[in-house]
C-alpha cells in the first residue's frame, strides 16, 4: 500500500516536471531553435544506431552534418534580431552571443568531414564519436548564451565532459589514456576553482546568479570594491585561464594534443577557445565591470606569458601536434588583446575576425596532419622532409596554412593580426602589442623551418616514411579533401577581402 502511494506521488511529480518543461520549451523554444535542431539530430542518431547495422554508417555522417548546417541556417535567419532573455533569465540571445555560436557550429561542421577518413581507417566507433561532437557543440552554444552562473557551469561541464571522453576515445592507446587522465584531473580542478569564484560573486551580490543582477546586487550591498571581489576575480581568471590554455595554466595542453586522436585535437583546439573566449568576455565585462583595471592587468600578464612561453617552447618540439599545442598557447595570447580592448577601438570585432581566420588556418593544418599520419603512421616533424616530391598538393597546402598562422602577407593571418595589434596600439597597450609582434616573428621561424623540410629535395634528408609514401585512395569519398580545400581558401582569400569581413563584424556587433 505504501509502495503504491509512493509510486503515484512519483508519477504526479514527474508529470508536473514534464509539463513545466514542455511549457517552457513551447514558449521559449524559438529562442533556442539552433540548439533544438542539434538535440533532434542527437535523438535521431541514437534511434538509427539502435535499429541499424554497419551498412548505415554513411547516414550517421549525413545526419550530423545536416543538423549542423540546419542549425547554422536557423542562426543566420535569426541574425540582427533584438536581444531577448528567455527561460526565466537563464538564457540570452543577442548578436554578440550568436557570432560565437556561429563560430562553434562552423568548427564542428568542418571537423566532421575531417574526421571521416580517420574513423574509417582506425575503425573507431562512429556513433559515439559523432554524439560526443554534437553534444560538445551543444554545450558550447549554450555556454555562449548562458546568462546566469548555474547555466554557465552546466553548459561548461557539458562541453568539458564530452572533451574528456573524446580525448580518450582510442582507449587501447596508452598515450590517449594518459592524456585523458591528465585532462580530467586538471579540468576537474579548474572547474572547482571556477565554481569557488562564482560562490564569491553569489555571496557578495546578496544571492544573485544572473550576470546583470550580480552587478545590481554588488551596487546594493556596496561590495563592488571589496577585497572579496578581487578574490573572486583571481579564482575565475584561473578557471577560465585553464579552459583557454593560457600560461601558466597550459600544462595539460601539449600532452592532450599529443595523446588524443588527431581529429579530436583539431576539434578541441578551436571550439574550446571560441567557447571559453565567449565566456571570458561576458564574465569580465558584466560582473567585473567595476574591476576593469584589475582584470585588464591580470589578462595582460597572462597574455604576455602565453605569447612568450608558447612560441619559444614551440621551437624545441619534435612532434607536429605538440608544436601546434604550444603555438595555440601563443595564438590565444593574441586573442586576449581583443578581449582587453573590448568595445572600444573595434577590439571585439577584430578578435572575432581573427578567430574566424584562426579556425580556417588551424583546421587546415590539422587536416593535413591527419592525412599524412594515416599514410605514414608518424607525427614527427623530421619525417615530413621531402614531402613535396611525393605529394605537392599536400605539402603546398600545409605550407600555406603554416604561413598564414605565422602571419605572413598577403595571407589571412597577417591581416587578422595586423588589425588586432592596431586595435591594441590605439587602446594604449604598447608593451603588449610589442611582445605580440616580437613573438609573431619567432613563430614565423619555426613555421618556416617546417616548410623548408617539406620542400627539401636532397635524398639524404628524406626519411623512409616519405620515401615509401603512397597516395592511397581515400575511403570516404574525398571528405577530408573537402575540408582541406575549404580551409586553404579561407586561409588565403580573406586576406584580400579583410575590410568587408571586418565591416560585417562591426555592423553586427554595433
From Swiss-Prot:
It holds the Pfam family Ndh2_N. GO terms for biological process: ATP synthesis coupled electron transport; photosynthesis, light reaction. It is an enzyme of class 7 (translocase). One of its GO terms (molecular function) is NADH dehydrogenase (ubiquinone) activity. GO terms for cellular component: chloroplast thylakoid membrane. Its EC number is 7.1.1.-. PANTHER family: NADH DEHYDROGENASE. NDH is composed of at least 16 different subunits, 5 of which are encoded in the nucleus. Belongs to the complex I subunit 2 family. This is NAD(P)H-quinone oxidoreductase subunit 2 A, chloroplastic. It comes from Lemna minor.
Amino acid at each position: 500500500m505504501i509502495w503504491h502511494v509512493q509510486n503515484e506521488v512519483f508519477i504526479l511529480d514527474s508529470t508536473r516536471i514534464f509539463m513545466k518543461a514542455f511549457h517552457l520549451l513551447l514558449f521559449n523554444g524559438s529562442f533556442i531553435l539552433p540548439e533544438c535542431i542539434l538535440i533532434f539530430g542527437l535523438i535521431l542518431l541514437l534511434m538509427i544506431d539502435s535499429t541499424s547495422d554497419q551498412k548505415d554508417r554513411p547516414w550517421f555522417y549525413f545526419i550530423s552534418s545536416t543538423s549542423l548546417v540546419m542549425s547554422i541556417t536557423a542562426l543566420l535567419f535569426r541574425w540582427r534580431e533584438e536581444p531577448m532573455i528567455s527561460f526565466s533569465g537563464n538564457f540570452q540571445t543577442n548578436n554578440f552571443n550568436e557570432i560565437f555560436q556561429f563560430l562553434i557550429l562552423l568548427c564542428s561542421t568542418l571537423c566532421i568531414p575531417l574526421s571521416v577518413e580517420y574513423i574509417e581507417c582506425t575503425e573507431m566507433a562512429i556513433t559515439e564519436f559523432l554524439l560526443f561532437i554534437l553534444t560538445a557543440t551543444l554545450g558550447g552554444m549554450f555556454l555562449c548564451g548562458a546568462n546566469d552562473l548555474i547555466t554557465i557551469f552546466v553548459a561548461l561541464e557539458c562541453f568539458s565532459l564530452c572533451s574528456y571522453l573524446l580525448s580518450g576515445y582510442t582507449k587501447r592507446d596508452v598515450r590517449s589514456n594518459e592524456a585523458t587522465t591528465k585532462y580530467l584531473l586538471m579540468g576537474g580542478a579548474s572547474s572547482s576553482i571556477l565554481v569557488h569564484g562564482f560562490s564569491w560573486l553569489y555571496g557578495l551580490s546578496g544571492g544573485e546568479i544572473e550576470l546583470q543582477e550580480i552587478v545590481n546586487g554588488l551596487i546594493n550591498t556596496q561590495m563592488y570594491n571589496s577585497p572579496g571581489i578581487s578574490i573572486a576575480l583571481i579564482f575565475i581568471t584561473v578557471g577560465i585561464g585553464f579552459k583557454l590554455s593560457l600560461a601558466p595554466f597550459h600544462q595539460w595542453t601539449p600532452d592532450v594534443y599529443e595523446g588524443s586522436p588527431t581529429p579530436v585535437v583539431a576539434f578541441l583546439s578551436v571550439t574550446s577557445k571560441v567557447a571559453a573566449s565567449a565566456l571570458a568576455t561576458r564574465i569580465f565585462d558584466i560582473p567585473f565591470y567595476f574591476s576593469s583595471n584589475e582584470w585588464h592587468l591580470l589578462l595582460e600578464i597572462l597574455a604576455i606569458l602565453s605569447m612568450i612561453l608558447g612560441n619559444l617552447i614551440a621551437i624545441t618540439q619534435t612532434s607536429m601536434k605538440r608544436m601546434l599545442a604550444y603555438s595555440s598557447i601563443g595564438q590565444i595570447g593574441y586573442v586576449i588583446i581583443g578581449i582587453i580592448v573590448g568595445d572600444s577601438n573595434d577590439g571585439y570585432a577584430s578578435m572575432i575576425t581573427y578567430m574566424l581566420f584562426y579556425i580556417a588556418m588551424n583546421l587546415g593544418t590539422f587536416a593535413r596532419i591527419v592525412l599524412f599520419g594515416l599514410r605514414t603512421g608518424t607525427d614527427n616533424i623530421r619525417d615530413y622532409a621531402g614531402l613535396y616530391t611525393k605529394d605537392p598538393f599536400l605539402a603546398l597546402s600545409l605550407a600555406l596554412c603554416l604561413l598564414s598562422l605565422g602571419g605572413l602577407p598577403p595571407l589571412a593571418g597577417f591581416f587578422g593580426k595586423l588589425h588586432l595589434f592596431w586595435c591594441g596600439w590605439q587602446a594604449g597597450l604598447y608593451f603588449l602589442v610589442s611582445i605580440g609582434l616580437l613573438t609573431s616573428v619567432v613563430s614565423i621561424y619555426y613555421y618556416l623551418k617546417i616548410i623548408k623540410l617539406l620542400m627539401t629535395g636532397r635524398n639524404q634528408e628524406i626519411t623512409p616514411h616519405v620515401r615509401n609514401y603512397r597516395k592511397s585512395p581515400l575511403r570516404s569519398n574525398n571528405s577530408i579533401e573537402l575540408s582541406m580545400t575549404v580551409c586553404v581558401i579561407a586561409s588565403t582569400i580573406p586576406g584580400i577581402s579583410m575590410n568587408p569581413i571586418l565591416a560585417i563584424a562591426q555592423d553586427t556587433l554595433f
